Amino acid sequence: MGIYQLCYLKMHSGMLFLAGHTEDKEKETLLKALSDVMDTARKAMAGKSFARSPYRAPIAALAAGAAAALAYLEQGEREKMREEILTALNAAAK
């Protein structure tokens, strides 16, 4: 299993956690999970061969969804946050 596949799986599992717990977890827990997803994306995108990776598009989709979800979380709009997460998961699956 390659490094980018591991990054994708870590990000995907974090986003699944977020999708299932947007309403019942404290804001700090959600911020930590989003931070983990974003940090993993940052590390993956800094890799030398990221541009040639087949996981480039899914990682970018999850990173964009996490960034949008963070903005909605900061505004207190958890339902929109969940929608962004689900949209990103759907885009990453294609």
Predicted segments, located by residue:
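Tandem-repeat/low-complexity and Cys-motif detector
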Residues: M1, A57-I59
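Short terminal alpha-helical segments
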Residues: M1-S35, L89-A93
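Generic L/I/V-rich hydrophobic alpha-helical segments across diverse proteins
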Residues: Y8-M11, M15, L34, M38-A41, ...
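Charged, low-complexity interaction regions
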Residues: G20-E28, A46-R56, A71-K80
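Short stretches within intrinsically disordered, low-complexity N-terminal or propeptide regions
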Residues: H21, S35, K43-A46, S53, ...
